[in-house]
Amino acid sequence: MKLKRMVVGLGERSYPIWIGGGIFSRLPEALQEVNFPKKIAVVSNPLVQSLYGQALADALQSSGYDHHFISIPDGEEHKNWTTLQTIYDGLIAKGFDRHCGLIALGGGVTGDMGGFAAATFLRGIPYIQVPTTLLAQVDSSVGGKTAINHPQGKNLIGAFYQPRHVHIDVDTLQSLDAREFATGMAEVIKYGIIKDKAFFDWLYTHREALQRRDTEALISAVKRACQIKANIVEVDEKEQALRAILNFGHTFGHAIENLSGYQTYRHGEAVAIGMMVAAHVSRRMDLCTADEVGAIERLLQVFDLPVTPPDYSLEAYLEAMQRDKKVQQGKLRLVLNKGIGDCLVQEIDAPAMLFAEALKQF
């Protein structure tokens, strides 16, 4: 049983992250370490519950935790008020109060919604993230962003609310289909592009081990991704400045998700395309070379990620991006890569021409 530990340092709201293979049974140990409440709601979807619900229930029960499952539908299209109401209803029906806790067991949708329910129920109850997808393990479970979608845009209703603990068992990644695994790799690759060229190169060197989901390779990749995100969150918890770089590829990616009705593309797939568009914009602004754009494209394609934007009009893309929550006073704030391993946030006054030129590259 391999276990790596790290801490997200946020003063009184600091919390540990455990990363390993076969560590699911050690969740009660982690709960005790952070003095988690004994009465727990486990928010999950039917598929994840069928895979891991019994193991979790056995571990909690054997350690004296009173637990209740609240089942919610999976999928980005269900990350809405109706599903949030289902969680509230379950908490109220089971008599939960401020001295109870919540575990979000599942992927990013479950983590975002479980976290937002915890942030808002009785003005806040403690929660723990147990992410079971690669995307959730390296992105949404770390940093305290919680949210639901609005018909006009993604994650428009949310709160910053840090978990007490994040419990990452990479063995859960063996159950993912190839497409779901790839969508998580998009976010892993993002960290290399924006902050760590050596990690970017490591991902390419270890591509075969990652593709076959070797436990050691997965632990190393997830740990480094979490370290990079934690270091950024520690400096800028609420995205006043530095944390915005985590949105590399996301402005255009969210536009793709919105225009496709959250149906055609998974989040990481949309972000992969968004990163390619951002890289071409960066190239147009002489922030990176054509070879570096090619290296980004090559690594994304290694993991079978899409790199070509869908055929929506430039006007549709611009309108969707203007609804992005990162727009300030009508100006787009784009994260652009400076080569590989560094980036900057750039306000774009006239995005139409820049994006028109970038889209011509596809």
UniProtKB/Swiss-Prot annotation:
The UniProt note on the cofactor reads as follows: Binds 1 divalent metal cation per subunit. Can use either Co(2+) or Zn(2+).
Kindly state a single biological-process term from the GO annotations of this entry.
aromatic amino acid family biosynthetic process
Q: What's in the keyword line of the UniProt record?
A: Amino-acid biosynthesis, Aromatic amino acid biosynthesis, Cobalt, Cytoplasm, Lyase, Metal-binding, NAD, Nucleotide-binding, Zinc
Q: What is its main location?
A: cytoplasm
Under InterPro entries, the record lists: Dehydroquinate_synthase, DHQ_synth_AroB, DHQ_synth_fam, DHQS/DOIS_N, DHQS_C
Q: What subcellular compartments does it reside in?
A: Cytoplasm
Specify which residues bind Zn(2+) according to the UniProt entry for this protein. Answer: 187, 250, 267
Q: In which pathway does it act?
A: Metabolic intermediate biosynthesis; chorismate biosynthesis; chorismate from D-erythrose 4-phosphate and phosphoenolpyruvate: step 2/7
Which GO terms fall under molecular function for this chain's record?
3-dehydroquinate synthase activity; metal ion binding; nucleotide binding
User: Which reaction is recorded as catalysed by this protein?
Assistant: 7-phospho-2-dehydro-3-deoxy-D-arabino-heptonate = 3-dehydroquinate + phosphate
Q: Name one Pfam family in it.
A: DHQS_C
Which residues of this UniProt protein bind NAD(+)? 74-79, 108-112, 132-133, 145, 154
Q: Does the keyword Metal-binding apply?
A: yes
Q: Does the keyword Nucleotide-binding apply?
A: yes
What do the Gene Ontology cellular component annotations say? cytoplasm
What Gene3D superfamilies does this protein's entry cite? 3.40.50.1970, Dehydroquinate synthase-like - alpha domain
Which NCBIfam families does the record associate with it?
aroB (TIGR01357)
Q: Which PANTHER family does this chain map to?
A: 3-DEHYDROQUINATE SYNTHASE, 3-DEHYDROQUINATE SYNTHASE, CHLOROPLASTIC
The record's function comment reads:
Catalyzes the conversion of 3-deoxy-D-arabino-heptulosonate 7-phosphate (DAHP) to dehydroquinate (DHQ).
Please state what the protein is called: 3-dehydroquinate synthase
Q: Which organism is it from?
A: Syntrophotalea carbinolica (strain DSM 2380 / NBRC 103641 / GraBd1)
* Phylogenetic lineage: Bacteria, Pseudomonadati, Thermodesulfobacteriota, Desulfuromonadia, Desulfuromonadales
